[in-house]
Amino acid sequence: MSGLAAAVRLSMFGQKVLLLEKHNAAGGLNSFYARGNRKYDVGLHALTNWVPEGAKGTPLTKLLRQLRIKREELDLCPQLGSLIKMGGKELRLNNQFQDLVEDVAAVFPRSIDQFKALDHYISSLDETSLEGQGGSARALLDEKLSDPLLRDMLLLPTCFYGSALENDIEVSQFAIMWRSLFKEGFARPFIGVRQVIRLLLDRCREHQVDRRMKCGVKQIVVRNTRAVALILDDGTEVTTDKIYSSAGAVETQRLRSDCSPQVAQSEIGRLGYLETISTYKPDDFSKFSWRETIIFFCDEERFNYQSPKSLVDPKSGVICIPNNYSYGSGRSLDEGWLRVTALANHDEWCRLPESEYLDQKTNWLNQLNRVARNHLKPIADAVHDGALTSTDVFTPRTVRKYTGHLNGAIYGSPVKRRDGRTDLENLFIIGTDQGFLGVTGAMLSGISMANLHGLKE
């Protein structure tokens, strides 16, 4: 998606752009796939940074302006309401920051002044600065907040939605998440990520971007300090003045003709995820009375955000119910949907023989469904199972197969390159490893890097 946004931005100013996509569906990590008659979103639990129409100076309004997209074209529908659940406590995330402040005051009365001071401090940071604000957010929270449970409850959603670091998140990324999750909020187009991709593809066609699908890059040819050509999977050589790569920083290095295929091993991300998707008969699903949009949960005393030693860590994760957005009168999804995400071990999943791999997908589908239902209004197993219409699971192995991201690391390398620069003067990193994450972040990444490296000369 960062590549689509960069292509649109560059082509708007008359630059000739070739957009190469390894797969047959656009969007990369923020895409969709079809199975049967259903289209499954990949990545999009919510489009973050939602603000009411008319709000100015926000990431959402910036990207709409820079891509010349009208807000109504996105068809954004705000969430009904989300929760952080841990240690028997709950905090609301419902697109109203004041409600979160009130919950902190009620649940952690001794910490409310500290929380307000923390908000003031984070709000003073320029979270989108391309220099970035290094350092540990966990250390920052240890310094600013005395209650360990409150610290963990704030790390829980920000890590799951934006950190490539184990057991921490960089301060600049934490500031981005603070704004996008807590101070602004969640929304979703009625048809999901396809709406965003459709708009970007329309803009690509409008500005004559040359798009080639199922056309991966085999090698980046390097001479001296420049990338001079691309060798495509079919052997075609393409020459270019500048290259913007959303393949990942390490993955991009390993494509270079002057680098070893094993370069930068220590910079590969370790955090993989498993996600289960279940669909339900709509009438039955409505009777479940599951009202939350997203639930960030942790069932342990302390929040551990690290690659598990076993296949999956079911003790913390994210529950998403895409039905629970305010779609407007007369509009509802055709089926009920339940998505559950948890940390998973890439290497352990890749070691499994095919038959055991399929068995374990079914096993963890059932286990995570049970975990999620422990955080939702109870329903009998027979009622639940009778309403079920389909299931699917993707693992770190799935992510690596279809995206090429090493270790199936959705958030990429823990080493981000905020200015997008590499040691080559005309090769730039966009997307996850530039440092802006999620759907909104991906588009802003493409826009920012196109502006900085392609339009300022």
State each model region's role.
Residues M1-D113:
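N-terminal glycine-rich phosphate/pyrophosphate-binding loop and immediately adjacent elements
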Residues L44, T432-G454:
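A conserved FAD-binding loop/helix module that cradles the flavin
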Residues E72-D75, D210-R212, F428:
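General small-molecule cofactor/ligand-binding pocket signal
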Residues M86-V171:
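Rossmann-like flavin
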Residues R151-A164, V318-I319, K377-F436:
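A glycine-rich dinucleotide-binding beta-alpha-beta segment and adjacent secondary-structure elements
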Residues F174-I231:
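Helical element adjacent to the flavin cofactor pocket in flavoenzyme catalytic cores
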Residues K218-S332:
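Mid-domain catalytic core of redox enzymes
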Residues P282-T391:
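C-terminal segments that line or cap access tunnels to active or ligand-binding sites in enzymes
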